[in-house]
């Protein structure tokens, strides 16, 4: 598959005050993964680490794990997806020390990126990017 997608806010049910359930989120995930695959795209699970054990059965091909070092969710993603995890750590939540700890702990097994949240273009003030 050449193209990739990563729908965000799979965990919206946790903030919906009962309007959405975990079952609703999983049903929506199945719809999105089916559509992505029909279009020839790979699709990532993003957020809702509690769904990681069922992620592949929901149709996800890999995971985008934001701040999993901060929230101690990395193990759930790597257990479910193996090396098919892309971890992103941010300067405003744990800083470079957190990123370095992530690299030391998992950097030889998965891709880890340190990036500014605003995705500032290279050469502009505020741009931050590292990878391990």
Model-derived features with residue positions:
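Hydrophobic residues within beta-strands of alpha/beta enzymes
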Residues: 5-7, 63
